[in-house]
């Protein structure tokens, strides 16, 4: 699954560790998400989008 996590995280000057803490997951989870090696649950996608200041999950994740 493609996503804009790295791009949006960089705009906010957040490290992977800082984003992970905001979301409540391990840094490795953020790494896997950014690389597209892990498909998040709906809840995790929502939490990541919220932590990145996105209005919609679709602003961060590309489904399909």
Report residues per predicted region.
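Alpha-helical residues within the helix-turn-helix
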Residues: 10, 21, 50
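Short hydrophobic/aromatic patches at helix-to-coil boundaries
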Residues: 2, 61-64
């Amino acid at each position: 699954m493609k996503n804009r996590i790295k791009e949006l995280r960089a705009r906010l000057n957040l490290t992977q560790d800082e984003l992970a803490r905001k979301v409540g997951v391990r840094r490795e989870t953020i790494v896997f998400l950014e690389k597209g090696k892990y498909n998040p649950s709906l809840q995790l996608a929502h939490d990541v989008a919220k932590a990145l200041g996105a209005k919609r999950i679709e602003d961060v994740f590309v489904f399909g």
